[in-house]
Amino acid sequence: ASINYRYLSIETPLPTSHHDARRALQFMRSKAKEWNLDKSRVAAFGGSAGAQICMWLAYSDDMAKPKSKDPIERESTRLTCVATTGGQTTNQTEFWKEMITDLMGPKIEAEGFVRPLGHLVDPEKVRMATWGAKTLEQANKKAARHSALSLISKDDPPIFMSYGMPPTAKPPADKGRARGWLIHHVNLGIALKKKTDALKLEAHLKYPGAELKYPSQVEFFVDKLSD
């Protein structure tokens, strides 16, 4: 199944899209009998922002509300496994600043890659509006609560991550292309792989030149979801 979620805007700040995805997952589980689904074997896949949302679902504790009057909210949000492409494993400003400096050089300011949001152009105001926060501190706390690197724990499911460049790739000269290159960079996956290895969790990181057990997320899903 595929889902739609509301995109980021001033009217629908994060984590609106995350909550839409959570609701969709619980809705599908609520239809398990009608649709002949095995609700004990559920995986998620997404790219870029969708990848970020999938990791949030995978690494969050179960958000089911067993006593809710809404039967959909009673359903589990836990996943059997997850696969991502070009996923942002963190929303933490300091991580991004450090990564951009490492990849682009000390003369390039991370703030220069911040896109306007609605009528807002100032990076700090954009960040607060992105998370529906009144202060940067509030925004940063919300960001941490929706970042895979902050959430992951030893009881979380396997992941298969894909990125389009090797760690040694050089950044594009064009700034517009460089932004897309940065926000989907393999270093984001490497950071999460270090965390999964430390927690002894199963994680597969695909990029050009990497040697892997699974050629793609398809084989990964088949293995994890089959009897």
Per-region residue spans from a language model:
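Mobile cap/lid helix-loop segments that gate and shape the active-site cleft of serine hydrolases
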Residues: 61-63, 93-153, 157, 181-184, ...
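Extracytoplasmic/secreted proteins, especially bacterial periplasmic and envelope-associated proteins
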Residues: 16, 20-23, 27, 52, ...
